Amino acid sequence: MEAQFIADIYAATAIGVGVILAAAGLGSAIGWGLICSKTLEGIARQPEMRPALMTNMFIFAGLMESFPFIILAFAMWFLFANPFVGAMQAALGA
């Protein structure tokens, strides 16, 4: 019975990690699109501000690009060092 509980925890964790990674990728893609579109709108309105706008775009795009990698690190932690398994084993008295 205990093995089934542990397997259920790993299965739920795998599903959760998949959803989290998909959401992080989708959020990053939407963020990239918004950043680039607003930068192009700003350049179209004020072409002389192009260098400043491009600098800001690359800074914020770098921050946006780092978000999925941070989420990936948390996902790997949940997959390989799952804190819920230890809690379940303690609750079951193993």
Curated annotation (Swiss-Prot):
CDD domains: ATP-synt_Fo_c_ATPE. The record marks 65 as: Reversibly protonated during proton transport. SUPFAM superfamilies: F1F0 ATP synthase subunit C (SSF81333). Keywords: ATP synthesis, Cell inner membrane, Cell membrane, CF(0), Hydrogen ion transport, Ion transport, Lipid-binding, Membrane, Transmembrane, Transmembrane helix, Transport. The keyword Transmembrane applies. It is found in: Cell inner membrane. One of its GO terms (cellular component) is plasma membrane. The chain crosses the membrane at residues 15-35, 58-78. It holds the Pfam family ATP-synt_C. It comes from the Bacteria. Belongs to the ATPase C chain family. F(1)F(0) ATP synthase produces ATP from ADP in the presence of a proton or sodium gradient. F-type ATPases consist of two structural domains, F(1) containing the extramembraneous catalytic core and F(0) containing the membrane proton channel, linked together by a central stalk and a peripheral stalk. During catalysis, ATP synthesis in the catalytic domain of F(1) is coupled via a rotary mechanism of the central stalk subunits to proton translocation. Key component of the F(0) channel; it plays a direct role in translocation across the membrane. A homomeric c-ring of between 10-14 subunits forms the central stalk rotor element with the F(1) delta and epsilon subunits. This is ATP synthase subunit c.
